[in-house]
Regions:
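Iron-sulfur cluster-binding electron-transfer modules in prokaryotic oxidoreductases
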Residues: 1-232
Length: 232
C-alpha cells in the first residue's frame, strides 16, 4: 500500500491518543482508495489495532494474521509441504494474538504440518508470558536494577522443554528473543525462528534455509559493529 503508515498501536499504548487518531484517520483515508477484500498483517499489534480499534474510527475491515492464512493455504493444498523438518520447537504466544484475540491453534497447526514437534512451555496460551516489548516498553530505557529481562526469563523457560527452536509469530518477539539468546549466553542452545521460516524450509524454497539466515544475520551484525567502531 502506497503511503502506508504505522497503524498506531505503540502511539496509543504510550498515551499519545492524538497521534493515534491522526494515524488512524490517515490510514483509513488511504485504505478507502484501495481495492481489497482482506488486510494481511504479520504483526499481532497491528492486527489488534486494525481489527478492534479502527472500527470506532470508521475503519471496518476483514483482518487476518499471517499464521491463519498459512494454515488455510496448507489445508487447501495451495501450500505443499514437501520436506517435513523433523525438529523440536516450542512456541511463544504473542499477547495480542493469543490473549487479546484468541488465536492459539493456527500457529501450532502450521508447526505440526511442517514437521515440528511442539514442546509447550508451562506458561502458554492464555497464560503466556510477555516478551517485555508490549505497552510501548520496547521504546523505554530498562530499569538499572533489573536483574533479568522478561525475554531472558522466557528463553530459560523454553530451554527446560528440551526444544532447540524458539518459534515466534510477531516482529517484536523476533527482536526481543533474538537479543535474549545472546544476552543470556544461549546462542548455541536455542535458535529463534519465525513461523513462516518453517513453511519456507518445509516447501524447500531457496534463501530460507537456517544456515543462510544465520550467515546473513551474522554479516549484518558485523557491519553494524564495524560502523560503531568507526564512529568511536
Amino acid at each position: 500500500m502506497k503511503d502506508e503508515k504505522s497503524a498506531g498501536n505503540d502511539a496509543r499504548r504510550v498515551g499519545e491518543e492524538g497521534l493515534f487518531d491522526a494515524l488512524a484517520e490517515d490510514n483509513i483515508q488511504t485504505l478507502e482508495n484501495c481495492d481489497f477484500q482482506h488486510i494481511l498483517t504479520t504483526d499481532p499489534h497491528t492486527y489488534n489495532t486494525l481489527r478492534n480499534e479502527y472500527p470506532s474510527k470508521g475503519g471496518v475491515y476483514s483482518v487476518k494474521h499471517y499464521s491463519t492464512l498459512l494454515m488455510e493455504l496448507i489445508h487447501s493444498g495451495e501450500i505443499e509441504i514437501t520436506k517435513p523438518l523433523n525438529i523440536k520447537g516450542t512456541y511463544h504466544d504473542p499477547c495480542y494474538l493469543g490473549r487479546y484475540n484468541g488465536i492459539f491453534d493456527a500457529p501450532r497447526e502450521v508447526m505440526r504440518q511442517c514437521g515440528v514437534e511442539l514442546l509447550e512451555m508451562p506458561r502458554n496460551r492464555t497464560n503466556s508470558f510477555c516478551c517485555g516489548a508490549g505497552g510501548g516498553q520496547v521504546w523505554k530505557k530498562e530499569h538499572e536494577d533489573m536483574k533479568q529481562r522478561p525475554s531472558e526469563n522466557r528463553i530459560e523457560e523454553a530451554l527446560q522443554t528440551g526444544a532447540n527452536y524458539f518459534t515466534v509469530a510477531c516482529p517484536k518477539d523476533m527482536t526481543m528473543y533474538s537479543d535474549a539468546v545472546k544476552t543470556s549466553g544461549n546462542e548455541e542452545k536455542m535458535i529463534v525462528r519465525d513461523l513462516v521460516d518453517y513453511v519456507a524450509e518445509a516447501m524447500e524454497l531457496e534463501k530460507f534455509t537456517n544456515e543462510e539466515t544465520k550467515e546473513t544475520m551474522s554479516e549484518s551484525f558485523k557491519v553494524e559493529k564495524d560502523a560503531s567502531e568507526l564512529q568511536a
